[in-house]
């Protein structure tokens, strides 16, 4: 096995406050720990993930790891971080990884680039840690709170996780420290330093913050709120031809020797777009909001349906990023009306024309559209919503 990850999540997180440990606080609908896990589960270079937890957190932990296939059975942590890491390493020994990354459970924003740099840093090194330059001035302060001097920060670095190690060497160092009753080492690089190994460094990232206090959690919530929740919905609709002298497509009346049968004006294009927008919102479908059993929608113009769906997006503080519509029929010919359809959809939705795409195709005379029995449409809608922050 090439690379394992050991995530330390056994702490109680008392400084963060709240009813649950900090690693189980929810950010954007997911726990901090799950967000941390996902960063590594999505990395192809990671084979397995071992999480060290507190026994009292079992129900919370099961929610955090639900559906994640790389995660091994949890291991109970010890009284200190050093003991917890040792327990996780002993459990991983059965899998024989060549490399191991040790990560804080409350560090949910680790960029993929940092993970890649951690793994690569072990090419030629036994231990490597992500660091950042110290930008604040550092002062020595005595017990009375008085400044006694200024530290030269040129050679100082702030240390993050994931810290990267050759697995066998890290396990041996932890065992040796335990045998020597050395129990005050605050990170795994310190354990390796104590054991006589050289620890290399690589670039960390300012976004790779550890959440320790209630203020950290609030800051993380604000950071997530600034990120858009991008969603895509799809829609599909079909209407058969019936008596008439025109068809409504995308809000445009196109002269034809037949019409389209439907409870409303049977605008197959606008119906598909409406369902696509509602689908992106997870807000039902056109039939749920405008049931054909309701006589008030008999003969209704379908621009009302699409405008309603667009307004639902805006009520939630979102925007429509793009609408894409494909009309499927042998006749009438859509090409001569394409620009008018795009313009009408843009008008209904109050969107720039560049955010609306309209295409047409045939089924090469196959199926009901090929037999000129009706028209089909499929659509997609991309929307951006503010990310909802969970409790």
Swiss-Prot record:
Catalytic reaction equation(s): 2-C-methyl-D-erythritol 4-phosphate + CTP + H(+) = 4-CDP-2-C-methyl-D-erythritol + diphosphate; 4-CDP-2-C-methyl-D-erythritol 2-phosphate = 2-C-methyl-D-erythritol 2,4-cyclic diphosphate + CMP
Keywords for this protein: Isoprene biosynthesis, Lyase, Metal-binding, Multifunctional enzyme, Nucleotidyltransferase, Transferase
List of residues binding 4-CDP-2-C-methyl-D-erythritol 2-phosphate: 237-239, 263-264, 285-287, 361-364, 368, 371
UniProt pathway annotation: Isoprenoid biosynthesis; isopentenyl diphosphate biosynthesis via DXP pathway; isopentenyl diphosphate from 1-deoxy-D-xylulose 5-phosphate: step 2/6; Isoprenoid biosynthesis; isopentenyl diphosphate biosynthesis via DXP pathway; isopentenyl diphosphate from 1-deoxy-D-xylulose 5-phosphate: step 4/6
Domain of life: Bacteria
Keyword Lyase: yes
Region entry 2-C-methyl-D-erythritol 4-phosphate cytidylyltransferase, spans: 1-230
Residues annotated as signal peptide: none
Swiss-Prot/TrEMBL cofactor(s): a divalent metal cation
E.C. no: 2.7.7.60, 4.6.1.12
InterPro entries: IspD, IspD/F, IspD/TarI, MECDP_synthase, MECDP_synthase_CS, MECDP_synthase_sf, Nucleotide-diphossugar_trans
GO biological processes: isopentenyl diphosphate biosynthetic process, methylerythritol 4-phosphate pathway; terpenoid biosynthetic process
Gene Ontology terms, MF aspect: 2-C-methyl-D-erythritol 2,4-cyclodiphosphate synthase activity; 2-C-methyl-D-erythritol 4-phosphate cytidylyltransferase activity; metal ion binding
Site annotation Transition state stabilizer: residues: 15, 22, 263, 362
Record: residues binding a divalent metal cation: 237, 239, 271
Site positions per UniProt: Positions MEP for the nucleophilic attack: 153, 210
Pfam families: IspD (PF01128), YgbB (PF02542)
SUPFAM superfamilies, per database record: IpsF-like, Nucleotide-diphospho-sugar transferases
Location of the region described as 2-C-methyl-D-erythritol 2,4-cyclodiphosphate synthase in the Swiss-Prot/TrEMBL record: 231-391
Record family assignment: In the N-terminal section; belongs to the IspD/TarI cytidylyltransferase family. IspD subfamily.
Function of the protein: Bifunctional enzyme that catalyzes the formation of 4-diphosphocytidyl-2-C-methyl-D-erythritol from CTP and 2-C-methyl-D-erythritol 4-phosphate (MEP) (IspD), and catalyzes the conversion of 4-diphosphocytidyl-2-C-methyl-D-erythritol 2-phosphate (CDP-ME2P) to 2-C-methyl-D-erythritol 2,4-cyclodiphosphate (ME-CPP) with a corresponding release of cytidine 5-monophosphate (CMP) (IspF).
PANTHER family: 2-C-METHYL-D-ERYTHRITOL 2,4-CYCLODIPHOSPHATE SYNTHASE, CHLOROPLASTIC
Protein known as: Bifunctional enzyme IspD/IspF
Gene this protein is translated from: ispDF
């Amino acid at each position: 096995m090439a690379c394992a990850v050991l995530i330390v999540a056994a702490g109680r997180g008392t400084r963060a406050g709240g009813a649950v440990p900090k690693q189980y606080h929810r950010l954007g609908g997911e726990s901090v720990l799950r967000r941390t896990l996902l960063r590594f589960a999505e990395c192809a270079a990671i084979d397995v993930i071992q999480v060290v937890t507190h026994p009292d957190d079992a129900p919370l932990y099961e929610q955090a790891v639900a559906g994640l296939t790389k995660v091994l059975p949890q291991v109970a942590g010890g009284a200190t971080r050093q003991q917890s890491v040792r327990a996780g390493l002993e459990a991983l020994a059965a899998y024989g990884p060549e490399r191991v990354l040790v990560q804080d459970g409350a560090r949910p924003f680790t960029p993929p680039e940092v993970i890649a740099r951690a793994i690569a840093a072990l090419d030629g090194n036994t231990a490597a840690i992500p660091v950042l330059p110290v930008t604040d001035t550092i002062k020595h302060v005595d017990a009375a709170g008085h400044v006694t001097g200024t530290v030269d920060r040129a050679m100082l670095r702030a240390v993050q996780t994931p810290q990267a190690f050759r697995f066998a060497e890290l396990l041996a160092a932890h065992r040796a420290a335990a045998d020597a009753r050395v129990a005050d080492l605050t990170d795994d690089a310190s354990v390796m330093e104590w054991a006589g190994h050289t620890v290399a460094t690589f670039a960390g990232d300012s976004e790779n913050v550890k959440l320790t206090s209630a203020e950290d959690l609030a800051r993380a919530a604000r950071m997530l709120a600034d990120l858009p929740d991008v969603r895509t919905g799809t829609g599909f609709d079909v209407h058969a031809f019936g008596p008439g002298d025109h068809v409504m497509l995308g809000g445009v009346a196109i002269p034809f020797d037949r019409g389209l049968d439907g409870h409303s004006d049977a605008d197959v294009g606008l119906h598909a777009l409406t369902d696509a927008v509602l689908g992106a919102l997870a807000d039902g479908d056109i039939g749920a909001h405008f049931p054909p059993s309701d006589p008030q929608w008999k003969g209704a113009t379908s621009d009302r349906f699409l405008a309603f769906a667009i307004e639902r997006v805006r009520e939630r503080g979102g925007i429509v990023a793009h609408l894409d519509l494909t009309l499927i029929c042998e006749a009438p010919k859509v090409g001569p009306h394409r620009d008018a359809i795009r313009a009408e959809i843009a008008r209904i939705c109050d969107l720039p024309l560049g955010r609306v795409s309209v295409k047409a195709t045939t089924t090469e005379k196959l199926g009901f559209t090929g037999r000129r029995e009706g028209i089909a449409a499929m659509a997609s809608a991309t929307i951006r919503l503010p990310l909802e922050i969970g409790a």
